[in-house]
A protein has these predicted regions:
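Sec-dependent N-terminal signal peptides
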Residues: 4-13
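N-terminal secretory-pathway/extracellular module detecting exported/lumenal segments
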Residues: 16-129
Length: 129
């Protein structure tokens, strides 16, 4: 139990608790997407950065309802692709409120299409113009 509590504290302290969220617009169905460029960390061609999905209406995951999700993303700057590392589901908007659930299963790399919000996030993470 102490290990779970410690890992949760570490994730939250490494995450965007007092983030400087930059809006990237709406992504259909009332979801606003934000990123915090101050959380970027680079390792070669790969960059990690926190992204926030803020919902106008409650979303369901299993039996919990949440209004925002903070995602720790990894971007490949050599190729336009990304993968999710961790997602934290939060009860309130803009990442505020109680943490309801957390998932950190390794995901697969997903290609990024030009002209999408994902492409804009990739450009921010990788310092592309």
């Amino acid at each position: 139990m102490k290990r779970l509590l410690l890992s949760t504290v570490l994730v939250l302290s490494a995450g965007p608790a007092s983030a400087e969220w930059m809006s990237f617009g709406e992504s259909g169905a009332g979801t606003t997407v934000y990123a915090d460029p101050t959380t970027k960390s680079r390792d070669g061609d790969q960059v990690n950065m926190w992204v926030l999905f803020d919902f106008k209406t409650a979303q369901a995951k299993a039996d919990v309802l949440y209004l925002s999700a903070k995602a720790h993303m990894k971007y490949d700057c050599a190729k336009p692709r990304y993968e999710g590392l961790t997602v934290i589901y939060v009860s309130g908007n803009m990442g505020n409120g109680n943490i309801l659930d957390r998932s950190s299963a390794k995901s697969m790399w997903l290609r990024i299409s030009p002209g999408t919000l994902d492409h804009d996030l990739w450009k921010l993470a990788c310092d592309k113009r």
